[in-house]
A protein has these predicted regions:
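A short, basic/flexible loop-to-alpha-helix module at the beginning of a structural domain
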Residues: 1-12
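Gly/Ser/Thr-rich beta-alpha loop segments that engage phosphate groups in nucleotides
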Residues: 20-25, 49-50, 59, 65
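Glycine-rich FAD pyrophosphate-binding loop
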Residues: 31-56
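N-terminal FAD cofactor-binding segment of flavoenzymes
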Residues: 53-54, 60-96
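N-terminal Rossmann-like FAD-binding beta1-loop-alpha1 element of flavoenzymes
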Residues: 12-39
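A secondary-structure boundary/capping signal
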Residues: 17-20, 42, 63, 69
Length: 100
């Protein structure tokens, strides 16, 4: 995250508690609209339930391994002038499942 001035830390326009996907998306949109946003997170890393835990050479997803609605992520990034696929490295699963 970007470093902020002491004034921004002391008096942000918006305080967001939690740096999971929802908190980060909200922060992106609000900051893009010109507000000073401060995100606070209790953990050392951002990501919330989308973090990965590594233990004994194995990787475990703490949250989703795929998003059912990637278009929502794409809309959020488009709203701030970025491409979600370039920024996040999203990989389409085609098909991820079939309804029969």
């Amino acid at each position: 995250m970007m470093a902020m001035s002491e004034a921004q830390r002391a008096d942000p326009d918006v305080l967001i508690v939690g740096a999971g996907p929802g908190g980060l998306a909200s922060a992106m949109l609000l900051a893009h609209s010109g507000l000073d946003v401060l995100v606070v997170e209790k953990c050392a890393e951002v990501g919330g339930r989308t973090k990965i835990i590594e233990q004994d050479g194995f990787r475990f997803d703490r949250g989703p391994t795929f998003f059912h609605y990637p278009e929502i992520i794409e809309e959020i990034f488009q709203a701030i002038g970025l491409d979600a696929h370039k920024e996040l490295g999203l990989i389409p699963l085609d098909p991820s499942y079939k309804l029969v």
